[in-house]
């Protein structure tokens, strides 16, 4: 038995919303730190913040994921001091080149979470990504 597109959308929307909240939290955190909190930040830094803000307003889709990959990789290359603040979930969510910055063990955890989400979707079972993530990472 397959699920309807509206049921699938509920599972996908919760997953998308969770990651959008992480993106928003990351953005808010880094704005309090150098170089973004400096009175005269350079144009590249301002453009990065603007692109991050625009990404949060952009609808989900291929260009959203591509832009997210570019911005997450830019954090690694241009702002390595911010890496401890970058939620690892965002590297997984945006995928692509971002996966190069994740160890295999971490990728395996996120793969299992995605499989659990898909299984729940197929079985019409309730599923909280946030709860499953916490359990997978030993937070419960």
Regions found by a protein language model. Give the residues of each.
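Short terminal alpha-helical segments
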Residues: 2-53
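A generic structural signal for ordered alpha-helices
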Residues: 4, 8, 26-33, 50, ...
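Short, well-ordered helical secondary-structure segments
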Residues: 10-13, 35, 39, 81-82, ...
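Charge-rich, solvent-exposed alpha-helical interaction surfaces
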Residues: 18-29, 47-55, 67, 71-75, ...
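Charged, low-complexity interaction regions
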Residues: 33-42, 57-63, 80-81, 104
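Non-catalytic interaction surface on structured domains
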Residues: 45-60, 71-78, 82-86, 95, ...
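Amphipathic protein-protein interaction modules
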Residues: 62-121
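Alpha-helical oligomerization segments
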Residues: 115-140
């Amino acid at each position: 038995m397959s699920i309807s597109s509206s049921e699938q959308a509920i599972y996908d929307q919760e997953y998308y919303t969770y990651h959008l909240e992480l993106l928003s939290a990351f953005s808010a955190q880094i704005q309090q730190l150098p170089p973004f909190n400096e009175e005269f930040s350079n144009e590249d830094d301002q453009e990065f913040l603007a692109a991050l803000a625009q990404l949060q307003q952009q609808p989900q889709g291929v260009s959203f994921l591509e832009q997210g990959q570019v911005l997450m990789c830019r954090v690694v290359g241009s702002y390595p001091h911010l890496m401890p603040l970058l939620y690892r979930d965002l590297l997984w969510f945006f995928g692509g080149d971002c996966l190069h910055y994740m160890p295999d063990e971490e990728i395996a955890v996120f793969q299992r979470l995605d499989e659990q989400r898909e299984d729940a979707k197929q079985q019409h079972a309730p599923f909280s990504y946030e709860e499953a993530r916490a359990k997978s990472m030993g937070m419960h």
